[in-house]
Amino acid sequence: METLRCPLSDHLTGIFNPDGEVAAARAAAENNVPYILSTATSTSIEEVAEANGDGVRWFQLYWPKNEDEEITISMLNRAKKAGYTALVVTLDTYILGWRPSDMDNGYVEVHHLKQSSLGAALTRLFNSYNPFLRPDHIGTAIGLSDPVFRARFKQKHGFECEQDMAAADAEWAGTVFPGTSHSWEDVAFLQKHWDGPIILKGIQTVADAKKCVEIGVQGIVVSNHGGRQVDGGVSSLAMLPKIVDAVGDKLEVLFDSGIRCGADIAKALALGAKMCLIGRPYIYGLALGGQAGMAHVFKSLLGELELTLHLAGILSAGKEHLNRDVLVREADMF
């Protein structure tokens, strides 16, 4: 069953538990679950690899702009050396979407507020919560441990990261959320510098899925980033069967965005997903119970998936049994 479940490493897990990615990586390995490490994490690539041991681990790249390609190469080399076997490339978050709840909670900086004295005061308050500007350096460990980023920071500013950690944190955040998208042609750069499977995350249209086949990547993740980037964007589940029909026999189609229970996994698999990625559910477990809490979430999801199949009279999770024939559209029920 391990091919049916793959936790997506929500970045900034250190906010929810001091052991953060270390606990997540250990729990994933102990439960035979592949682990995906985000670029925006509070633990270095190497430390997570050590915690994950013999587990299967992938690296999720938040892709710097082309002018920072030396930093990208450095991260890829570090990940490969540390035993990460696949590269997951985030396409839909080179800039953060309009997130009212995050702004209400001071979770992201609202730049336009700085134009007034009140705005400046509010900005200082927000920055005390902004994960990339906190004094405990949540989300910036990969950058602060990267030799190329550190060398470029020193060359630019004339001092080491440790001499102004707030400036280093902010610069790393700007590096991995550059505000500049990449082109299809840029994928060739990743293929040149990564010799393992490449999976493009954030595919939401048949046309883009076909383009992924054309450029020769090994997989895609049908994903709208949990619905947090574009308000009113089409749901990933609605697009999944169309994309599977178009390219499912040519590359691996994975799915995320909204998985909360085993029944959700069953639906996605029935619609043709090869694997489901999860994020928020395991964060709940991590926050409440650390490594053991994560293990409980894994077992609960898998247990509910198995019960769902049993009670629906489905013999296995293989496509010969779990497919669209077992689904009924709500529109067809009335």
Question: What does each model-identified segment do?
Answer:
Residues 1-210, 214, 226-229:
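Active-site entrance/lid segments in N-terminal catalytic domains of soluble metabolic enzymes
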Residues 238-256, 260-334:
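Alpha/beta catalytic cores of nucleotide-metabolism and tRNA/nucleoside-modifying enzymes
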Residues 45-46, 210-213, 217-255:
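Extended hydrophobic/aromatic segments used for targeting, binding, or gating
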Residues 34, 85, 218, 274, ...:
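Short acidic/polar active-site loop segments enriched in Thr and Asp
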Residues 6, 199, 221, 254, ...:
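Conserved beta-strand segments that form the floor/walls of ligand-binding pockets within enzyme
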Residues 55-61, 219-224, 275-279:
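Short hydrophobic/aromatic-enriched beta-strand-loop microsegments
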Residues 24, 44, 71-75, 83, ...:
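General structural feature for long, well-ordered alpha-helical segments within catalytic domains
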